Amino acid sequence: MEANHQRNDLGLVALTMLAQYHNISLNPEEIKHKFDLDGNGLSLTSWLLAAKSLALKAKHIKKEISRLHLVNLPALVWQDNGKHFLLVKVDTDNNRYLTYNLEQDAPQILSQDEFEACYQGQLILVTSRASVVGQLAKFDFTWFIPAVIKYRKIFLETLIVSIFLQIFALITPLFFQVVMDKVLVHRGFSTLNIITVALAIVIIFEIVLSGLRTYVFSHSTSRIDVELGAKLFRHLLSLPISYFENRRVGDTVARVRELDQIRNFLTGQALTSVLDLLFSFIFFAVMWYYSPKLTLVILGSLPCYILWSIFISPILRRRLDEKFARSADNQAFLVESVTAINMIKAMAVAPQMTDTWDKQLASYVSSSFRVTVLATIGQQGVQLIQKTVMVINLWLGAHLVISGDLSIGQLIAFNMLSGQVIAPVIRLAQLWQDFQQVGISVTRLGDVLNSPTEQYQGKLSLPEIQGDIAFKNIRFRYKPDAPTILNNVNLEIKKGEVIGIVGRSGSGKSTLTKLLQRFYIPENGQVLIDGHDLALADPNWLRRQIGVVLQDNVLLNRSIRENIALSEPGMSMERVIYAAKLAGAHDFISELREGYNTIVGEQGAGLSGGQRQRIAIARALVNNPKILIFDEATSALDYESEHIIMQNMQKICQGRTVILIAHRLSTVKNADRIIVMEKGEIVEQGKHHELLQNSNGLYSYLHQLQLN
């Protein structure tokens, strides 16, 4: 019975965690009620049915350990003894397995032997509909195949032009052969004139067609580049907030800039060289007709080029990886330094920052130099093979001419044809560094484009928000191995109610509002607005109806009017002014020289802190949200600015649900109800005077500290 109970707990915990990973919220008690009918725990069948009810695609498979790196992770390792665990990542290089121990509620790294000892060969693969679509649209080199198919007509035209170019390339050596073997021997001036005119016509057509091919090809690849750039930016803005919190700004910027490498590769000569290489088989047939021996020399050189590239490529890729990492470090440090310039100057730490920059820059230059040296060695190796083949062909060709097996004209024609074959090979070999760089660029961009966006279980047509809020049995932490931030939080807020939330730093106040904005999905429990589970709601629909004012608000480098009307650029001036008056910002805006057309500067640098905050409040109010969140919105203001805002607070709160998070208790003392949080739990709630009556309570303690 105990084993069944344990299996029941672990199966349910696993389903909860996997659903959370796919941005789907669930109520464990409801799942247990529906699918654990006999009370003996979730069987394999009932587990799969429960997953299906959550719009998850779950499949039970048997997989050998050697093939685990091929499956989509995370997955549930199903154990007959009920001791299930999650398989998160397979490190094939070091033969290690990152798992999540559901019994200990902690991540665990297992060696090959440890994993083999506990793995019974059964997996449950879990994906959501959204993630299945994401896998089908996974960004790698195959992403360009649909783009090529889309522009197949243009690429077909390019292919036809390439065929004509190769025909002209085939004709030219034949003209030279005729001149050497016929015209010079028989002194045929009339034939020479005809061949010269014909050759001139061929050259003109070749130049025109070559330019046309480059133009058409560049035009189509530029359109692919535009599509990729647009998709990248849209996807970037659709990523969850956790993606940006777990990465440095400089890293993200560096990955986006990798688009330039792909652009240069697409519009360069590499792809046209591939087309030229495809026609080499025709040239080989003609060359074989001239001299099988000389053709075998050329054919024998091709494996040399391939083997040399195979030898160089892994080393080059490792060094390019290192170069990118150093470049990303520099980018991140530069962004951090520019962002923190006020602090750097205030603390006079420019020498220390410069020293760090010099070291990082030296590291980048060193890694870049190593890439250049290796690329040069690779190119010189290609040149060595080419020159060696040329010498062998010259020696062997001369012998064939002397022995009468080959004419001088045929030897010249053969060398011209071999040049047409080898030239694209050499160009591709020399462009191999670019290809390696593009491979890394695609991988880096894939980190952005393959990251799951904010998804929701279904597109429900939810009505306009009224303002009722409920947190039910909320348990949350930011990462599986991180401490619990919210634990068993239950809170109901009626529409039109003004709620104050206070507590020590790190007590979970701001996290509660982040769950309300659906920045995160709770590990357990539900967040409801007007009775609707936010896990089912479109995040954009939700956030458009919630106004948020933070302690540090960001203004864009635009006019005041554009900042206030950011969510609706075509908004009437009357609405903008009304929101500004409500936020107490209209008077100081009117005193500015350009008024509402004043450019605020980057992040609002041209305004004072109080002015920025009031514009941020106006921006939050302009859409008349039914729910308004003030997260330490007045804590950094001077008393005069705070007084102006607090004077208008009654008008601001009218007709909407308001959540005030503050350290200053004076900000929340007039709230309809005050929630006191401590270590992720609600420890007290009531009105200001009611909470003060409990002299041993946390609120009374904080109030006494502020009075003193």
Swiss-Prot record:
Transmembrane intervals: 159-179, 192-212, 270-290, 296-316, 389-409
Catalysed reaction, written as an equation: ATP + H2O + proteinSide 1 = ADP + phosphate + proteinSide 2
UniProt superkingdom: Bacteria
Free-text domain note: In LktB the peptidase C39 domain, the ATP-binding domain (NBD) and the transmembrane domain (TMD) are fused.
NCBIfam families (UniProt xref): type_I_sec_HlyB
Localization, UniProt: Cell inner membrane
Organism of this sequence: Mannheimia glucosida
Membrane topology per record: Multi-pass membrane protein
Presence of the UniProt keyword Cytoplasm in the record: no
EC code(s) of this entry: 7.4.2.5
Quaternary data: Homodimer.
Protein name: Leukotoxin translocation ATP-binding protein LktB
Effect after changing N40K: In strain: Serotype A11 / PH240 and Serotype UG3 / PH496
